[in-house]
């Protein structure tokens, strides 16, 4: 039976085995999917050993995505742009192909929730790996403008400069943010620490869409805050998790699983996984 893994540290909380087991059942693919939690300095050795022992593919999560980028034999265009790898496939000719499905998962989930991207004004909070992975897929949807805000403004400026060839992307400090946005995406991990990005409430209006890449059994702090400011459409990152997994499954197996039922099952079981 074909073997797949998710590498991370920590990774015991990962929902990936649950998701991919449901995908396999739905598409009648025979595979097993497990967890690997090597020490940071042992990731390269563990990755090579997994494929040497017959592994077919893996997902890679924090803190190994940048290491994986350097370890694979070949990169997909979207992984090269993202500077990080979250999906690796052993190809038929024995090559380790590195891909990044995070941004595609984000865009798919936004569309599933009816969020219009073409011609929109998007505010992206954060300039780390999650933001980098999202930029190319978001800009491919041709928004009117995409503004990056980050606590360290120089990082936002650098990221905007790297992606300016793909569309109207710019950087702004939190203090100077103003104007109208149709969508705000929080790519920071602030919600995990119970913190909020330093946004002024005036940016929130009834018709704005709010997206937090983090998720939980209850509203994230960012989503709870936005609702309190009058935002009517708020979405957490659970759907993005399922959509990026579906994209990875497609890379590995050549068949695209449906995501709606899997997302429903995941929400139903979130408190026990």
Swiss-Prot record:
Pathway: Metabolic intermediate biosynthesis; chorismate biosynthesis; chorismate from D-erythrose 4-phosphate and phosphoenolpyruvate: step 4/7. The gene is aroE. It comes from Aeromonas hydrophila subsp. hydrophila (strain ATCC 7966 / DSM 30187 / BCRC 13018 / CCUG 14551 / JCM 1027 / KCTC 2358 / NCIMB 9240 / NCTC 8049). It catalyses: shikimate + NADP(+) = 3-dehydroshikimate + NADPH + H(+). SUPFAM superfamilies: Aminoacid dehydrogenase-like, N-terminal domain, NAD(P)-binding Rossmann-fold domains. It comes from the Bacteria. Involved in the biosynthesis of the chorismate, which leads to the biosynthesis of aromatic amino acids. Catalyzes the reversible NADPH linked reduction of 3-dehydroshikimate (DHSA) to yield shikimate (SA). GO terms for molecular function: NADP binding; shikimate 3-dehydrogenase (NADP+) activity. The lineage of its organism: Bacteria, Pseudomonadati, Pseudomonadota, Gammaproteobacteria, Aeromonadales. GO terms for cellular component: cytosol. This is Shikimate dehydrogenase (NADP(+)). NADP(+) binds at residues 126-130, 150-155, 213, 237. Shikimate binds at residues 14-16, 61, 86, 102, 215. Gene3D superfamilies: Leucine Dehydrogenase, chain A, domain 1, NAD(P)-binding Rossmann-like Domain. Homodimer.
